[in-house]
Amino acid sequence: MSKTIAVNAGSSTVKFKLFDMPSEEVVAEGNIERIGMDMGHAKIKYGDGQVSEEEKPFPNHGTAVSYLLDQLINLGIVKEYHEITAVGHRIVAGGEFFKDSVVIDDDVMQKIDELAEYAPLHNPAELQGIKAFKRVLPDAFAVAVFDTSFHSNMPEMNALYSVPYEWYEKYGARKYGAHGTSHRYVASRAAEMLGKPLEDLKLITCHIGAGASITAIKNGKSFDTSMGFSPLAGVTMATRSGDVDPSLVAFVQSKLGISSEEMIELLNHKSGLLGLSELSADMRDVQAAAEHGNKQCELALEIYENRVLKYIGSYLAELGGADAIVFTAGVGENDKEFRQAIGDKLAYFGVKVDPEKNDVRGEERDVSADDAKIKVLLIPTNEELMIVHDIERLRKQA
């Protein structure tokens, strides 16, 4: 049997899932962390619950990838490298170059490198991952799958900002969005659950995790999305601020006497639930404190829910209603109270969450009441499987 590996390389990490094909069964998954630091950590899950863990230095992505592939052989997961016939790489920023997933060649790698200014923490690391796998698996069918491609064809009225048009022409100043692979996956599953073609549906997909984005989907395509030029925009997140008045950013930056880079760092890593609660970026910690009377945590949760509610409401207006609202990712999949709260506040639109159906974690399910006008669906995301599907589609076209 041939195997396909889906890869997500971060600035100091490599995460992967290995699939048997064509069954699409996951035979191994894991990650290597702290690449480039004094001591790294590798963890691989395989077989019937077996786990391999090791602490050792990984000076760069190349050594991490070589270790990973060697371990797949050492653990008996594959017998030889050439069993892995395809590699799919998740890439954060595809700009306006890439409106779909593509087979990787030298030109594609050059473009990914050029787009690094749009995602300086991600694209360079992802390019290192591509090169590392190409060195060890030179004959594997390699594909790049972009977080931004799903949103690249959204209407200009939603993609562009109300700033001088030449900023878009000269600098690519527009909304690129993120989590596109996740939104595509759950939208396709929603269509199957509803028994209708995706092209005939109006959906609002809510990827609510540490990073969070909400997308309005019309005729199977992204119509609008909450994240913007970067993944910092949109709803309140674990450590990210979401939408903030730019004047406030400039005002506080001046008061603190810090650089633009330091200000962006604060908005990315010290804001959101963490900044509001001054306690934790983890929703569970904030909820527990709120239940014990912590007023600041109560407020943080109210703001968090309200920002999600505002985006869903605006997208219901933009789409002229919806067939379904879909929840996915860490909070969306696992937090029944959050789903119930959002559903209850959308009752005016015909949304109704059934508390009994909603009493579930991480399981694909219609959690709406039988008489709901707009369905509420819980769909665990599977970005790696979406990458595998893109590989197979491009293989057939090759």
Swiss-Prot record:
Tell whether Metal-binding is among the UniProt keywords: yes
Question: Where does this polypeptide localize?
Answer: Cytoplasm
Q: Which residues bind ATP?
A: K15, H207, I208, G209, A210, G211, D282, M283, R284, G330, V331, G332, E333, N334
**Any Pfam family:** Acetate_kinase
Query: Top EC class per UniProt?
Result: transferase
* Primary subcellular site in the record, as a coarse category: cytoplasm
Report the catalytic activity: acetate + ATP = acetyl phosphate + ADP
PROSITE patterns from the UniProt entry: ACETATE_KINASE_1 (PS01075), ACETATE_KINASE_2 (PS01076)
Subunit relationships: Homodimer.
Has UniProt tagged this entry with the keyword Cytoplasm? yes
Active site annotation, chain numbering: D147
A biological process from GO: acetyl-CoA biosynthetic process
Which CDD domains does this chain map to?
ASKHA_NBD_AcK_PK
Instruction: State its Enzyme Commission number(s).
Output: 2.7.2.1
State the Gene3D superfamilies in the record. Answer: 3.30.420.40
Q: Where does Mg(2+) bind?
A: N8, E383
Q: Where does the chain bind substrate?
A: R90
Please report the name of this protein according to its UniProt entry. Acetate kinase
The organism's lineage is: Bacteria, Bacillati, Bacillota, Bacilli, Lactobacillales
InterPro entries on file = Ac/propionate_kinase, Aliphatic_acid_kin_short-chain, Aliphatic_acid_kinase_CS, ATPase_NBD
Instruction: Give the metabolic or biological pathway.
Output: Metabolic intermediate biosynthesis; acetyl-CoA biosynthesis; acetyl-CoA from acetate: step 1/2
A GO MF term: ATP binding
Write out the entry's keywords from A to Z.
Answer: ATP-binding, Cytoplasm, Kinase, Magnesium, Metal-binding, Nucleotide-binding, Transferase
Which residues are annotated as site, described as Transition state stabilizer?
Answer: H179, R240
**Listed cofactors:** Mg(2+); Mn(2+)
The similarity comment for this entry is: Belongs to the acetokinase family.
